């Protein structure tokens, strides 16, 4: 019986040593309750004025960083919905430019629900920052006048599909 207990304890120790506490997933709802996502750590928010190819707006970024990987949601509102598609393209281009990158995959979709237009883009890009290979995976979405970017950016070898899919897949527009 003692051997079984020792073996069980040893096995538990081995299994637990493989667990990584680095990702501490938590559900987060934006301050105005317009969106929700699951972050891998405690997020912080900041706002700043940006220029989306000539359209000036204020973007709020909410992000968490884990092991040099940034998980972020950005949101802004345009004066009218007509510029939404161009705004998404400008947001995407700026992020790809930030990593000195090139788009390796992209897909665009659009739909209309109750007269409200929804446009989304899925993007993957690779590049370098400060001489280090970087990877960006993003979901860009327009709902009427509101634009959202849900992105994971980090060292190319550290950005894993499991965490990326969990984060981006958890994003929901609530209103």
Identify the meaning behind each predicted range.
Residues 1-11:
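Bacterial N-terminal signal peptides that target proteins for export
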Residues 15-18:
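C-terminal motif of bacterial Sec signal peptides marking the signal peptidase cleavage site
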Residues 20-22:
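Bacterial signal peptide processing site
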Residues 26-51, 55, 65-67:
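Post-signal peptide N-terminal segment of mature Sec-exported envelope proteins
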Residues 33, 67, 76-78, 128, ...:
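Solvent-exposed coil/turn segments that connect beta secondary-structure elements
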Residues 42-61, 93-143:
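Signature of long, low-cysteine stretches enriched in small and polar/charged residues
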Residues 43-45, 87-103, 145-175:
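Surface-exposed amphipathic alpha-helical segments
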Residues 61-90, 148-151:
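A short acidic-to-branched-hydrophobic micro-motif
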């Amino acid at each position: 019986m003692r051997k079984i207990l020792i073996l069980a304890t040893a096995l538990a120790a081995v299994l637990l040593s493989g667990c990584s506490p680095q990702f501490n997933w938590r559900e987060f709802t934006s301050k105005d309750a317009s969106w929700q996502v699951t972050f891998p750590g405690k997020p912080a928010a900041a706002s700043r004025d940006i220029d989306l190819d000539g359209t000036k707006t204020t973007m709020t970024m909410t992000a968490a960083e884990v092991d040099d990987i940034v998980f972020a949601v950005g949101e802004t509102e345009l004066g009218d919905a007509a510029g939404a598609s161009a705004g998404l393209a400008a947001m995407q281009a700026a992020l790809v430019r930030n990593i000195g990158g090139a788009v390796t995959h992209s897909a665009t979709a659009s739909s209309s629900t109750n007269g409200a237009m929804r446009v989304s883009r899925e993007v993957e890009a690779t590049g370098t920052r400060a001489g280090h290979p970087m990877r960006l995976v993003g979901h860009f979405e327009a709902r009427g006048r509101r634009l959202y970017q849900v992105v994971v950016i980090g060292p190319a070898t550290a950005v894993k599909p499991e965490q990326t899919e969990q984060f981006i897949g958890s994003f929901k527009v609530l209103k």
